[in-house]
From Swiss-Prot:
<feature type="region of interest" description="Disordered">
    <location>
        <begin position="455"/>
        <end position="479"/>
    </location>
</feature>
<keyword id="KW-0874">Quinone</keyword>
<keyword id="KW-0472">Membrane</keyword>
<feature type="transmembrane region" description="Helical">
    <location>
        <begin position="285"/>
        <end position="305"/>
    </location>
</feature>
<dbReference type="InterPro" id="IPR001750">
    <property type="entry name" value="ND/Mrp_TM"/>
</dbReference>
<dbReference type="Pfam" id="PF00662">
    <property type="entry name" value="Proton_antipo_N"/>
</dbReference>
<dbReference type="GO" id="GO:0008137">
    <property type="term" value="F:NADH dehydrogenase (ubiquinone) activity"/>
</dbReference>
<dbReference type="GO" id="GO:0005886">
    <property type="term" value="C:plasma membrane"/>
</dbReference>
<comment type="similarity">
    <text>Belongs to the complex I subunit 5 family.</text>
</comment>
<dbReference type="GO" id="GO:0042773">
    <property type="term" value="P:ATP synthesis coupled electron transport"/>
</dbReference>
<keyword id="KW-0520">NAD</keyword>
<dbReference type="InterPro" id="IPR018393">
    <property type="entry name" value="NADHpl_OxRdtase_5_subgr"/>
</dbReference>
<feature type="transmembrane region" description="Helical">
    <location>
        <begin position="3"/>
        <end position="23"/>
    </location>
</feature>
<comment type="function">
    <text>NDH-1 shuttles electrons from NADH, via FMN and iron-sulfur (Fe-S) centers, to quinones in the respiratory chain. Couples the redox reaction to proton translocation (for every two electrons transferred, four hydrogen ions are translocated across the cytoplasmic membrane), and thus conserves the redox energy in a proton gradient.</text>
</comment>
<keyword id="KW-1278">Translocase</keyword>
<feature type="transmembrane region" description="Helical">
    <location>
        <begin position="634"/>
        <end position="654"/>
    </location>
</feature>
<feature type="transmembrane region" description="Helical">
    <location>
        <begin position="485"/>
        <end position="505"/>
    </location>
</feature>
C-alpha cells in the first residue's frame, strides 16, 4: 500500500504537466482530464484510508521513501512521504472537496477561452497541497508550501487582463513571502539545534519522544514563533491577513479551493503537526491563542460590513480559521477540535462559496448583495444548499458547525484561569457576530424585495466577468435562474457534509480516537459545564440572528449602502489594514529608501569620488615636477639628499 502514496501526488501533478504543456489541442477535453485525475487521487485516498482503518490505532503510519535528495557527508535530506491519521484526514479533504470544485468548474468556466490552463493550475494546486501534508520532513513540506504559494498566485491572477486581479495576485504572493521567510528560518533553526528536520527524530512518535521533547524552552519558543509566522501568512491570520479579501479577484471556484480545503488550512496543519514543538513552548502557545482570538473577531467584524458576497465570505473564512488557530494554541486540549472544525468548515465553506458562484452565475456575475433579493424563488437548489451551509456555519444545533465550534469553545474555557475566560468569551462573541453577518448575507441574497429589477447599471466591482463581457460596453438586466447540474451536484454533496459531518465525527468521539495517537489529547477542568457552554453558544447564535433579522429582514434593504457608524466604515475598508500597512511598512520603507539613497550619494559616493579627486589633484601637482629642466632635477636631488642627511643626524641625536 505504501507505493500508492506517491500516486496520490503524481495524479494531479501529471494533470498539471499535461494541461499546461499540451497546448491548444487539449482545449476540448482538458477540463475533463483535470477533473478525472483529481478524482483518481481521491479514489486512491479512499483506498489508503480503508487500509489504515484495518490497522491498529498505533500502526497507522505508512512511509514511502522515493530517493535521497541532498546526500552529503553527515546529512541527508530525503524525498519521502508519511501517511498517518493526520495527513490522511487532509488527503481526503483536499482531494474530495477539490474534485467537487473541479466538477463545478467544468460548467462555471465553460465560456472561458483559457479553461484548459485554469484546470492545469487547479491540478498544480492540489499536487502542491498534497506534497505539503504528506511530506515526511520540513524541507519537503517547504517545497509543497512554496508550490501552494505559486499556484495561488496563478489562480488569483488568472484573469490578468484585469489590473485588480494582477494586483491581488501580487499582494497575496508578497504577503506570503513574509510568512515563508518564517518557515525557512524555523527550518534552519531546527537543523542548527537538532541536526535534522525530519518529523520522526524531531517530533517523535509511536510512544517515543523526539528531540523537541528534551530541548531548551527558549530554542523551542524561537522555532515555534517562526512556524507561527508562516502559519499567519498561509492561513491569513493577523498580522498577515490583508491578502485574503483581495484574493476574491480570482474565479469563484478558486475562492472555494483556497478558502475551504487547501491554502488557508495549511497553517493550521503546520501548527498541529508541530505540536511537540509548541507543547514545549508555552509562551509561543499563548501567542498562538492570542492571534487566533484576535483574528476570529477581526474577520467577523469585517464580514459584517461587506456588501460583496464573496468578500463577506472571505471575512468569514478569516474568522473561522481564527477559531482553528485558537484551538491549536490550546495544545493537546484543542488539537483534535482544531482539525475537526477544519474538516467541517471545508464542507460548509466550500458549499457557501460555490453557492455564491451559483448566485453570480444567475445574476450576470453581480457580486453586490444590495442588488440581489428574493432569489430563493428562482434558485431553489442554490437556496437550499446555501441555506444548509449557512445553518452549519452559525452553529445551528445538530449541524456540523455546531459540534466542532462548540468543542472549541469548551476547550477555550477548559484552559482555565483568566486566560480561559478571556478566550472563551472571545469565542462566544465570535459566534454571535458570525450568526449576525451570515444571516445578513442570507437575507440580502434570498429574501426581501427583488432589488435587481431596479438596478439599471452593473456594479463597478465584478470579479468573475469574462473578457468578452467586460469589454462589450453593454449591460443586460439579470434573469435569475438555477445553475446547471454540473454546478448543483457538488453543492448538494457539500450540503450533505455540512449537515452530517459534525454528528458523524462526534458520535462515540470517533474523530478524537482517530487523531489522538498523532495529536494527543487531554481534558482540562472547565469552570463551567459542557451544557452551560452549549446553552451560551446557542444563545449567542440566536441573538446574532435576531439582530440581523431586525435590520435586514423586517426593513427594506437600501440599494445604496448608508454611511454607517465609524466602525462600519472602517470594516468596509478591512479595519484599515491596508492603510496601516501603507503607513507603517510602505511609507516607512519609502523613508528608509530615501535615507539610504542620501547616504549612498553623500557618504559612499563621496568617499569614492573624494578619493578619485584627491588622487587626481596629487597627480597634477606631481606632474609639475616633471618640467624637463636638468637644473630642476638637480635641485630636487640636492633637496632630497639634504633631507636624508638631516633625518640621519636627527635619529643619531635621539
Amino acid at each position: 500500500m505504501e507505493n500508492l502514496i506517491a500516486l496520490l501526488v503524481a495524479a494531479p501533478l501529471l494533470g498539471a504537466v499535461v494541461l499546461l504543456c499540451g497546448g491548444r489541442r487539449l482545449d476540448r477535453v482538458g477540463h475533463w482530464i483535470g477533473t478525472l485525475l483529481a478524482a483518481v487521487s481521491f479514489v486512491l485516498g479512499v483506498v489508503l484510508f480503508a487500509d489504515l482503518l484495518g490497522s491498529g490505532a498505533e500502526d497507522r503510519t505508512l512511509t514511502q521513501h522515493l530517493f535521497s535528495w541532498i546526500p552529503v557527508e553527515g546529512f541527508q535530506a530525503d524525498v519521502a512521504f508519511r501517511l498517518d491519521q493526520l495527513s490522511m484526514t487532509f488527503v481526503l479533504l483536499i482531494t474530495g472537496v477539490g474534485s467537487l470544485i473541479h466538477l463545478y468548474s467544468v460548467a462555471y468556466m465553460e465560456h472561458d477561452e483559457r479553461r484548459r490552463r485554469f484546470f492545469g493550475y487547479l491540478n498544480l494546486f492540489l499536487a502542491a497541497m498534497l506534497i505539503l501534508v504528506l511530506a515526511d520532513n520540513y524541507l519537503l513540506l517547504y517545497v509543497g508550501w512554496e508550490g501552494v504559494g505559486l499556484a495561488s498566485y496563478l489562480l488569483i491572477g488568472f484573469w490578468q487582463h484585469k489590473p485588480s486581479a494582477a494586483t491581488a495576485a501580487k499582494k497575496a504572493f508578497l504577503v506570503n513571502r513574509v510568512g515563508d521567510m518564517g518557515l525557512s528560518i524555523g527550518i534552519m533553526l531546527m537543523f542548527l539545534w537538532f541536526g535534522t528536520f525530519a518529523f520522526g527524530p524531531v517530533l517523535g512518535g509511536h510512544g517515543e519522544a523526539g528531540l523537541a521533547a528534551g530541548a531548551d524552552e527558549g530554542k523551542l519558543t524561537a522555532i515555534a514563533l517562526m512556524l507561527l509566522l508562516a502559519a499567519c501568512g498561509k492561513s491569513a491570520q493577523v498580522p498577515l491577513q490583508s491578502w485574503l479579501g483581495d484574493a476574491m479577484e480570482g474565479p469563484t471556484p478558486v475562492s472555494a479551493l483556497i478558502h475551504a480545503a487547501t491554502m488557508v488550512t495549511a497553517g493550521v496543519y503546520l501548527i498541529v503537526r508541530s505540536g511537540a514543538i509548541f507543547n514545549g513552548a508555552p509562551d509561543a502557545q499563548l501567542v498562538v491563542t492570542i492571534v487566533g482570538a484576535v483574528t476570529l473577531l477581526f474577520g467577523a467584524i469585517v464580514g459584517c460590513a461587506k456588501d460583496d458576497i464573496k468578500k463577506a465570505l472571505a471575512g468569514s473564512t478569516m474568522s473561522q480559521i481564527g477559531y482553528m488557530v485558537l484551538a491549536a494554541g490550546l495544545g493537546p486540549i484543542g488539537y483534535v477540535f482544531a482539525i475537526m472544525h477544519l474538516v467541517t468548515h471545508g464542507f460548509f465553506k466550500a458549499g457557501l462559496f460555490l453557492g455564491a458562484g451559483s448566485v453570480m452565475h444567475g445574476m450576470n456575475d453581480e457580486v453586490d448583495m444590495r442588488r440581489y433579493g428574493g432569489l430563493r424563488k428562482y434558485m431553489p437548489v442554490t437556496f437550499v444548499t446555501f441555506g444548509l451551509g449557512y445553518l452549519a456555519i452559525i452553529g445551528f444545533p445538530g449541524l456540523s458547525g455546531f459540534f466542532s465550534k462548540d468543542k472549541i469553545i469548551e476547550a477555550a474555557f477548559a484552559k482555565g484561569g483568566t486566560e480561559g475566560w478571556i478566550l472563551g468569551a472571545c469565542a462566544l462573541l465570535g459566534a454571535a457576530i458570525t450568526a449576525y453577518y451570515m444571516t445578513r448575507v442570507m437575507l440580502m441574497t434570498f429574501f426581501g424585495e427583488e432589488r435587481w429589477r431596479n438596478a439599471p447599471t452593473p456594479s463597478p466591482a465584478k470579479p468573475d466577468v469574462e473578457p468578452a463581457a467586460e469589454t462589450r460596453g453593454t449591460y443586460e438586466p439579470p434573469h435569475p435562474h438555477e445553475s446547471p447540474g454540473l454546478m448543483t451536484i457538488p453543492m448538494i454533496v457539500l450540503a450533505v457534509g455540512s449537515v452530517g459531518a459534525g454528528a458523524f465525527f462526534s458520535i462515540g468521539d470517533r474523530f478524537m480516537h482517530w487523531l489522538e495517537p498523532i495529536t494527543g489529547h487531554s481534558h482540562g477542568d472547565s469552570p463551567i459545564s459542557a451544557g452551560a457552554v452549549t446553552g451560551a453558544t446557542v444563545a449567542c447564535m440566536v441573538i446574532g440572528v435576531a439582530v440581523a433579522w431586525a435590520q435586514y429582514g423586517r426593513r427594506p434593504v437600501p440599494a445604496v449602502a448608508p454611511r454607517g457608524s465609524l466602525l462600519t466604515r472602517a470594516a468596509r475598508r478591512d479595519l484599515l489594514q491596508d492603510d496601516f500597512n501603507h503607513v507603517v511598512l510602505v511609507r516607512g520603507g519609502e523613508h528608509l529608501t530615501r535615507s539610504l539613497v542620501y547616504v549612498d550619494h553623500t557618504v559612499v559616493d563621496g568617499v569614492v569620488n573624494g578619493t578619485a579627486a584627491s588622487v587626481g589633484g596629487l597627480s597634477g601637482r606631481m606632474r609639475r615636477l616633471q618640467n624637463g629642466f636638468a637644473r630642476s632635477y638637480a635641485v630636487s636631488m640636492f633637496g632630497g639628499a639634504a633631507l636624508l642627511v638631516a633625518a640621519t643626524l636627527l635619529m643619531r641625536a635621539v
